[in-house]
Amino acid sequence: MATATTTTATESPSNSGRRQARYLCLTILGYRKPGMSEEDYRNHMVNVSAPLTKDLMVKYGVKRWTQIHNQSETKALMSQLFDPQMCNLADYDCFSQVVFENIEDYKRMKQDPWYKKHLVGDHENFADTKRSQMTIGWVEEFVRDGQVVEGFKG
């Protein structure tokens, strides 16, 4: 029988010897619902889903939430960056990243009655939930606002 693992932000030493928190980042590699235009998808995520979601995320300790919309216009820019090492273009429509300290907080948010009532069903309005993928990992930050930094600050 498998056992569940609880993961929280951990302290790790920085180059200066200070202890700093490590944060988790849930990345959702999203596809839009079949038949939906890129702009309708972006509009729903930015103007419908985000306003419904952001206060709930704050309530449960989310430190940062971003959406990166990968539309035809920006996909075309990739041709300027291709080289032998960077030549495979991702076809996802959006990358949504949620940063938090404690996975239990995120799990509690998903159990919130408001989340279940308003957000679970909303995903079916714009997302291809069968094709979209997810991953989670530790955040390592090196540059913020044009400045070198020693790790992510929540």
From Swiss-Prot:
Induction: Expression is positively regulated by the transcriptional regulator wor1. Expression is down-regulated during biotrophic growth within tomato leaves.
GO MF: lyase activity; oxidoreductase activity
Family matches, as InterPro entries: Dimeric_a/b-barrel (IPR011008), EthD_dom (IPR009799)
Entry keyword set: Lyase
EC number: 4.1.1.-
Catalytic activity entry: atrochrysone carboxylate + H(+) = atrochrysone + CO2
Leader sequence residues: none
Biological pathway: Pigment biosynthesis
Tree of life domain: Eukaryota
Anything else known: Contrary to the other identified cladofulvin biosynthesis genes, claH is not locatilzed in the cladofulvin cluster, but is co-regulated with the cluster genes.
Family: Belongs to the tpcK family.
Function per UniProt: Decarboxylase involved in the biosynthesis of the bianthraquinone cladofulvin, a conidial pigment not required for virulence but that plays a role in fitness and resistance to environmental stresses including UV light and low-temperature stress. The pathway begins with the synthesis of atrochrysone thioester by the polyketide synthase (PKS) claG. The atrochrysone carboxyl ACP thioesterase claF then breaks the thioester bond and releases the atrochrysone carboxylic acid from claG.
Protein name: Decarboxylase claH
